Regions:
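Accessible peptide chain termini
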Residues: 1-2, 234
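Sec-dependent signal peptide recognition
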Residues: 4-11, 24-33
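Short, intrinsically disordered, low-complexity terminal segments
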Residues: 8, 39-40
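Short, intrinsically disordered terminal tails adjacent to the first/last structured region
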Residues: 2-4, 114
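Formylglycine-dependent sulfatase
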Residues: 27-28, 35, 41-234
């Protein structure tokens, strides 16, 4: 029996937050609204396009929007300036697999069996919100890292829980450790494949900054070690 995606305010378990800026309803606010309010008024006829972007193994202070002078994130800053900027947010797990499974199912890791453990499997019984969007008429897909690491096939799923994969386009990375997946070109392929003005939902799972450490990479990036802010717990 399918475990339904929860139709409550807990449908977005990735954060318990206060936010400092809320202006135009851009991509982030659209996503939050879509996840928190899956049952919309019948009077609403238009369906907003949704672009979900998630980095891998990144702590919240490491963005210039949060005041970091070492890490420059102009794209993230633009979203923060025109949407919502959270300053008290929490993930449900420090591991990739369970954290992403929580996002996809709207449930805590302890509620989703194997999907709540790292690098395991993803039981087919649990509904994922991309599938619900597809049922509602959306064209869905993902590039980069979707749900993982783990084996989603073993439970009988026909595709990654994040949606159909768009990872064919590749590039020559500028630095060692940077993914060779061409996120933007894969997104263009996705848009080309949809029918007309069909509403879309697309997951961009950047593998960065979770990558092997490269000796003296800070010198190549013209950074100074003395500018690194070490967390107090280290």
């Amino acid at each position: 029996m399918k475990r339904k995606f929860p139709k409550t305010l807990f449908a977005l378990p990735i954060c318990s937050s206060t936010f400092t800026r809320m202006s135009n309803k851009h991509i982030l606010s659209t996503l939050v609204s879509s996840l928190l309010i899956p049952q919309v008024s019948a009077a609403v006829t238009s369906k907003p396009n949704i672009l979900f972007v998630i980095s891998d193994d990144q702590s919240y202070p490491h963005a210039s929007a949060y005041g970091s002078s070492l890490v420059k994130t102009p794209g993230f800053d633009l979203v923060a300036q025109n949407g919502w900027l959270f300053n008290n947010a929490f993930v449900t797990s420090p591991g990739s697999s369970p954290s992403r499974a929580s996002i996809l199912t709207g449930l805590y890791p302890w509620q989703i069996e194997e999907a709540g453990t790292h690098a395991s499997s993803f039981p087919i019984d649990y509904e994922c919100f991309p599938d619900l969007l597809e049922e509602a008429g959306y064209y869905i897909g993902y590039t980069g890292k979707g749900w993982g690491p783990g084996n989603w096939k073993i439970s009988g799923r026909r595709r990654n829980p994040a949606g159909p994969e768009y990872n064919k386009r590749r590039i020559r990375p500028p630095y060692k450790g940077i993914s060779n997946i061409n996120y933007s070109q894969n997104f263009k392929d996705f848009l080309h494949d949809r029918e007309g003005k069909q509403p879309f939902y697309f997951w961009v799972g950047a593998n960065e900054p979770h990558r092997p450490y490269e000796k003296d990479s800070w010198e190549k990036a013209d950074k100074r070690l003395v500018d690194v802010e070490v967390p107090p717990f280290l």
